[in-house]
Amino acid sequence: MSADVSGTESGSESGPEPEPGPEPGPESRPESRPKPGPGPEPRPESGPEPGPRSGLRRGPKQGSERSQLCPEHFEPLSWFCLSERRPVCATCAGFGGRCHRHRIRRAEEHAEELRNKIVDQCERLQLQSAGISKYMAEVLQGKNQKAVVMASAARDLIIQRLSLVRSLCESEEQRLLEQVHGEEERAHQSILTQRAHWVDAVQKLDTLRTNMVDMITHLDDLQLIQREQEIFERAEEAEGILDPQDSEKLSFNEKCAWSPLLTQLWAASVLGSLSGVEEVLIDERTVSPLLHLSEDRRTLTFIAKKSKVCSDEPERFDHWPNALAATAFQTGLHAWIVNVKHSCAYKVGVASDQLPRKGSGNDCRLGHNAFSWVFSRYDQEFCFSHNGYHEPLPLLRCPAQLGMLLDLQAGELVFYEPASGTVLHIHRASFPQVLFPVFAVADQLISIVRGPLATVRLDSPPHHPCRSGHASR
């Protein structure tokens, strides 16, 4: 777009514009100065030229610039036309010249601006290269080590469980080990691919930066202007190299080691053996005043009114009908069974020793905080609850017994029905170091099954119709 030099148009490029008058220059000159003749035009007055940034050297001296003359007026190409994007002489830019009404600026100013842009781009390329190098050195290396460790842990877990049921699942063992190996190879290959990609990206960035530095140091103003399009193309190519981002494809997927068949057989093997069942007793100091504890410390019975006999100990739950076991689990594999056939409102599971005991808030309510993981029933509704999240469990019948299997090494809590051999729910998490079996009952009673009774299986378990409980969840 053209604009009259006498106006005050503002454009994206700053610089002096020509004014009407007898002088051929784009700036106003002193009245005492003569009109330009056919020879070289005197240099217009200007302030000190800005020096190059970041310590980069300027191009060749002005002697080589004067050797470039206007083909029409044979004058130095000391000005740059922003409208036609080409260098022009002072006569072309002055009054009556072909670029008289165009936006112009000094060629050296335009070249200096290009130099500054190249310097800025070089700095950005250097920072981008440093970021990619840091990503390769820290993130990719850590991902590779973590994938190897996680793959090894998953492999050991699979072999340990399959040792209990080797005769029934040899083919399953082979399949799962191949999946773990394939996932490990996939994660490792993804990391290698990422590393190769970013090494190539760094090399491209270094090459682009080197070429741009060469342009600054070896090209004069006119040559630099003539290669402006190439400069922008290289800058655009550099912008096309994105910054590295973390991805799940670089991580080992633990789900490749999960197997419903393996979990079913493993849980049945542990709960079906006498040595696999814990001797769990309830800690009478934690029993709520709404519950009555039997003499053998295995049965909890709900009572409508709070007992006045219970002392107010710090370990006791004073509002919700809860109780903790006296047995603490810190490592290894643990299993226990609870008889729940008489109750339509109960919760069973595990809880951390950090579970609060006093008050009516959710911080003391099982399944509504981060310190408890429970299987709960209310009337005909079943769910798994943790930290306020309740996952419904569609059961076809009310279980008479509930088996719990806690594997602290694998971070798994399995709720299991011993009578049918059915896994009701599996929860995987990073559990705290100390866990206790936890119980809550708001209807009738529940009781912990003794160890020797854990091997009992009912060929046709009796159906217990679900009764509506009267206590709140």
Curated annotation (Swiss-Prot):
It comes from Mus musculus. One of its GO terms (biological process) is calcium ion transport. GO terms for cellular component: cytoplasm; membrane. One of its GO terms (molecular function) is vitamin D binding. It comes from the Eukaryota. Residues 35-51 have a biased composition (Pro residues). This is B box and SPRY domain-containing protein. According to PubMed:10978534, testis-specific. According to PubMed:16371431, broadly expressed. The gene is Bspry. The keyword Transcription does not apply. It is found in: Cytoplasm; Membrane. Interacts with YWHAZ/14-3-3 protein zeta. Interacts with TRPV5 and TRPV6. Signal peptide: none annotated. SMART domains: PRY, SPRY. PANTHER family: E3 UBIQUITIN-PROTEIN LIGASE TRIM. Residues 1-69 are annotated as: Disordered. Induction: Down-regulated by vitamin D.
